[in-house]
From Swiss-Prot:
Region of interest called G1, as start-end residue ranges on this chain: 15-22
Matches recorded under CDD domains: Era, KH-II_Era
Molecular function terms from GO: GTP binding; GTPase activity; ribosomal small subunit binding; small ribosomal subunit rRNA binding
Described purpose of this protein according to its UniProt entry: An essential GTPase that binds both GDP and GTP, with rapid nucleotide exchange. Plays a role in 16S rRNA processing and 30S ribosomal subunit biogenesis and possibly also in cell cycle regulation and energy metabolism.
Gene: era
GO biological process assignments: ribosomal small subunit assembly
Domain named KH type-2: residues: 205-283
Record-stated family: Belongs to the TRAFAC class TrmE-Era-EngA-EngB-Septin-like GTPase superfamily. Era GTPase family.
Protein name in the entry: GTPase Era
Positions of the UniProt region annotated as G5: 153-155
Region (G2) residue spans: 41-45
Top-level taxon of the source organism: Bacteria
Positions with a binding annotation for GTP: 15-22, 62-66, 124-127
Length: 298
């Protein structure tokens, strides 16, 4: 047997909403595959990012934030996150250095008590927090759970992230190569394109509008000469008033969303993109199980 066996495994990144889970995954991969915003509950689906290092393949799983779920959509999101705890080789519990452990963190710790995989506590945003406060956080969490490792990082600047990845590599079991080494994620490009459009809605609208929005890519066609990708997508909202906000005065907001999304999709695909957006109303879709399935939340 080799003295340095190949290691591989699945690693879930969990935490309450808006602690930097998606930012951390994008930082590790060196590419943006997961959308981000300053609003909580941006991530809705389980997304896998594949990171290859010498002697190992790490499959990171970005999850929705764990929170009190009221709508059917939110309950789906929480179940996605909880299932990612049960099915992995390692759990990264991400918290913020500038926030004391509260009720949400304790609820997650209570869930972790039933986890069979080891758990790392990853303390994010240390660049925005005084060292004394970081040490206080470490002590507070140590009293609550027997974490395998406690790792301070900044997903925003990258500080400590390489060290975290090395600790993750060492903690994984021996295993096979799950994905080809040129694969960055298991989700298709059309899914990422839809997520980019939804991200722009999150960033450019306010109040309930982002949370009432879903995006479907209706068509994704590549020209035979490879010179252009034509994408048609539908933005679904729950109210006529929300549709009006998305479209904006004389279509200005929809044009702004489409323009920003197109630029980012072109970077993703490394080609020119023609993007056409439509807006429709499906009343209370986030509470309707049939519509949730149609929109991909299953």
């Amino acid at each position: 047997m080799s003295d340095n066996p190949f290691r591989s495994g699945f690693v879930s990144i969990i935490g309450r909403p808006n602690v930097g889970k998606s930012t951390l995954l994008n930082r590790i991969l060196g590419e943006k595959i997961v959308i981000t915003s300053d609003k909580p509950q941006t991530t809705r689906n389980r997304i896998q990012g594949i990171h290859n290092v010498p002697g190992a393949q790490i499959v990171f799983i970005d999850t929705p934030g764990i929170h009190q779920a009221r709508s059917r959509l939110n309950k789906y999101m929480v179940e996605v996150a909880l299932s990612a705890i049960r099915e992995v080789d390692l759990v990264l519990f991400l918290v913020e250095a500038n926030q004391k452990p509260g009720e949400q963190e304790q609820e997650i710790i209570d869930v972790l008590a039933g986890a069979t995989a080891p758990v790392f506590l990853v303390i994010n945003k240390v660049d925005l927090t005084e060292k004394g406060a970081v040490l206080e956080r470490i002590a507070a969490y140590k009293d609550r759970y027997p974490f395998r490792e406690i790792v301070p990082i900044s997903a925003g600047t990258g500080d400590g992230v390489d060290h975290l990845v090395e600790l993750v590599r060492k903690a994984l079991p021996q295993g096979p190569v799950y994905f080809p080494d040129d694969i960055l994620t298991d989700v298709p490009e059309r899914f990422i394109a839809a997520e980019i459009i939804r991200e722009k809605v999150f960033r450019m609208t306010r109040d309930e509008v982002p949370y009432a929005t879903a995006v479907e890519v209706d068509s994704f066609k590549e020209r035979e000469d490879g010179g252009l990708v034509s994408i048609a997508a539908t933005i679904t909202v729950e109210r006529d008033s929300q549709k009006g906000i998305i479209i904006g005065k004389k279509g200005a907001m929809l044009k702004k969303i489409g323009s920003a999304a197109r630029v980012e999709i072109e970077k993703l695909l490394n080609t020119k993109v023609f993007l056409e957006l439509f807006v429709r109303v499906r009343k209370d879709w986030s509470e309707d199980e049939r519509m949730l399935k149609e929109l991909g939340y299953t």
